[in-house]
Amino acid sequence: MKKILEIKNASVFQGRTQVFKDLTLDINSSHSTAIIGPNGSGKSTLLKLLGREIYPVHSSESFVRIFAKERWVVSELKKYLGIVSYSLQQNYSADAMGLYVVLSGFYGSDGVWSFQSFSNDQIEKAKSTIRDLGLYELIGRKFETMSTGEQRKFLLARALVHDPQVLVLDEPTSGLDLRASFKYLEDIRGLMRSGKRIVLVTHHIHEIPPEISQIVFLKDGKVVANGLKDKLLNSQNLTDLFETPINVVKSNGYFQTVPG
């Protein structure tokens, strides 16, 4: 089975700042994975590598492969990888209607523009995806009039419209109240139970659904651990990762943290 992501000895800069030096990381498609780390650990840069927004420094001894390929046309990559990020929600076109939010996924744009066109099959696919997520009554509503949770679910539908092999979720419950968080996480769990692979990027342990089995710890631009969730998510490891005393409590398959 192909690896979702394979990085070897990659050095990556954001502007003049080096975020990764000789980074090596594998994420397999045989299971769902959570990438955990404090702010500044390199999580956002890793997401940009996945989405081909940035590239590593060229070297004959390094590579970044996504589904075993180093070079992608971004529009083709979206058929394999659907990304839902908090930053996209913040920057999305406010006056876009619900249907157009989902249709924009076919172009990877943050709105629908006059030069874009859609086939009947694409429109029907968008509508069926909206319906599957229980959003059909909002199909004609403007994005800016929706609740944060409704917006997040429309962006999830936008990512799903290609039926990608893998969903990448960046801090999935950020900005959501408890009720919306629980509903959104249940949607994610439903997708995983139906066979969808998830890569979840977060610094909030409570966002990690029980179905995720693999964990990557990222700190200061380095992978400090990569292994099974039940072995890595413990009080000592998280205390070391976040450099503050933490106690871990497990309930109903979820992990919670409290001050140590």
Feature names for model-found ranges:
Residues 5, 19-22:
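Conserved structural motif at the start of ABC-family nucleotide-binding domains
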Residues 103, 118-138:
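Conserved ABC ATPase "signature" region
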Residues 116-118, 142-146:
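Conserved ABC ATPase signature
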Residues 167-171:
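Catalytic Walker B motif of ABC-type/P-loop ATPase nucleotide-binding domains
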Residues 208-210:
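A short, surface-exposed alpha-helical micro-motif characterized by mixed small hydrophobic
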Residues 239-260:
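ABC ATPase nucleotide-binding domains
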